[in-house]
From Swiss-Prot:
One of its GO terms (cellular component) is bacterial nucleoid. Involved in DNA repair and RecF pathway recombination. GO terms for biological process: DNA recombination; double-strand break repair. This is DNA repair protein RecO. Keywords: DNA damage, DNA recombination, DNA repair. Belongs to the RecO family. The keyword DNA damage applies. Pfam families: RecO_C, RecO_N. The keyword DNA damage applies.
């Protein structure tokens, strides 16, 4: 979608970078333009009228003027600020992690409405307090799918035979779950029958449906190890927000 000289767009602020003494460069995830960068002049000054509308996690309607190197933000109005998330360290860490992933999985100026809606829905569900751990798993699995990395969960990702109800192996390098026979030639971590079932259910159902799931800590741990390995494989690095999220869990905050 071609941008006019002056334009408005709904956007989620997924990243902010200091620039000069009082300015910022903001990364905005939009439904129609994909990931775009915006220059926010003097937004770090206490007198700035825009600062409260351009914070990380804000869902806002943003006005921009097209520039040669970068667009300039000329106005912004908050649509949703997710106050419950901001008032909780744990939820904030989860939301920042989701925003970081959305940033890394979004090529600049390539529209991905499904990814935008996925992030917005995830922030709304986290703000509502609806099973935050499952909410994050739902986001991660569907993020992979909407970005072209949907893991194979019903047949072996290597030999393509139907998976049997036994211990199988999750292999990001192979593109999903592999069978015990292929484990001899491929790298993979063990996943139980129930973990694979939960992965399938999350991948194939709405968030309102997965909220009804009752998952024990062992399955949740297997899910986390598998999905994190997949994300790390795609990004070729560990998301920075994970360190904060894990430290809060260890401190039980």
């Amino acid at each position: 979608m071609t941008k006019p000289h002056d334009f408005k767009t709904k956007a989620i602020i997924v990243r902010k970078t200091k620039c000069g003494e009082a300015d910022r460069i903001l990364s905005l995830l939009t439904p129609d333009l994909g990931l775009i960068q915006g220059f926010a002049k003097s937004v770090r000054k206490t007198t700035s009228k825009l600062s409260g509308h351009l914070e990380l996690l804000c869902y806002s309607e943003v006005s921009l003027a097209r520039g040669k190197a970068i667009d300039t933000i000329t106005g912004s109005q908050t649509i949703q600020s997710f106050l419950n998330i901001r008032n909780s360290l744990q939820l904030s860490a989860m939301a920042f992690y989701a925003c970081e992933l959305a940033y890394h999985f979004s090529p600049e100026e390539a529209a991905n409405p499904a990814l935008f809606q996925l992030l917005l829905s995830t922030l709304e569900e986290l703000d509502n307090g609806s099973q935050p751990e499952l909410c994050l798993k739902y986001f991660e699995i569907n993020l992979l799918a909407s970005s072209g990395y949907k893991p194979e969960l019903r047949e072996c990702a290597n030999c393509h035979k139907k998976l049997q109800a036994t211990i199988n192996y999750y292999s990001p390098e192979s593109g999903g779950v592999i069978c015990p026979n292929c484990r001899n030639t491929q790298i993979g971590m063990p996943v139980s029958v129930n973990t694979v079932k939960v992965l399938r259910y999350i991948q194939e159902n709405s968030f309102s449906s997965i909220c009804r799931l009752k998952i024990n800590r062992e399955i949740l741990s297997e899910l986390e190890l598998a999905i994190r390995a997949n994300i790390r494989f795609v990004l070729e690095k560990e998301p920075k927000a994970l360190f904060w999220l894990d430290s809060l869990r260890l401190a039980d905050l």
